[in-house]
Amino acid sequence: MTDAEQTIKNQKTQEAEQSLRVFLRSENATLPTRGSVLSAGYDIYASEEAVIPAQGQGLVGTDISVAVPIGTYGRVAPRSGLAVKHGISTGAGVIDADYRGEVKVVLFNHAQKDFTIQKGDRIAQLVLEKIVMADIKQITAEELDITARGEGGFGSTGKN
């Protein structure tokens, strides 16, 4: 392989590593979209009709599989409009870089009435976040840095 061919191969590899690659598993799947040029997340769509019961939860399919860029993971986050207008939030939202199964969305309905999702509705957003892959090192209590906060948690730093 010539130097030029190797350079082109390296460029293509880098481009693939920086792309959100999406496989549409069926004709019911919709490619994720961004609401605006500066949107942090990609809207993801339901591939099926579903009803999330009042005060309940449900698992909604998207019929997509993704390959996130190296050094990132995908976080499934709520859509603000669904949260404010309908009391819908998301859960269990980590997509690891090596996961290749269908992306499914856990939805919680905090409202007092059932919420119906139609095929093609935007149900969540996928946000790519950088990660640090740190080695784990077991330490002793003496090696644990002392901080001003100490063991305070669960509201210990303020009144509200």
From Swiss-Prot:
InterPro entries: dUTPase, dUTPase-like, dUTPase-like_sf, dUTPase_trimeric. Its cofactor is Mg(2+). The keyword Metal-binding applies. GO terms for biological process: dITP catabolic process; dUMP biosynthetic process; dUTP catabolic process. It holds the Pfam family dUTPase. GO terms for molecular function: dITP diphosphatase activity; dUTP diphosphatase activity; magnesium ion binding. DUMP binds at S80, G93, D96, Y99, K104, R149, F154, G155. It catalyses: dUTP + H2O = dUMP + diphosphate + H(+). Coiled coil: none annotated. Its EC number is 3.6.1.23. Keywords: Hydrolase, Magnesium, Metal-binding, Nucleotide metabolism. Pathway: Pyrimidine metabolism; dUMP biosynthesis; dUMP from dCTP (dUTP route): step 2/2. Gene3D superfamilies: 2.70.40.10. The keyword Zinc does not apply. Involved in nucleotide metabolism via production of dUMP, the immediate precursor of thymidine nucleotides, and decreases the intracellular concentration of dUTP so that uracil cannot be incorporated into DNA. Homotrimer. Belongs to the dUTPase family. This is Deoxyuridine 5'-triphosphate nucleotidohydrolase. It comes from Debaryomyces hansenii (strain ATCC 36239 / CBS 767 / BCRC 21394 / JCM 1990 / NBRC 0083 / IGC 2968). The gene is DUT1.
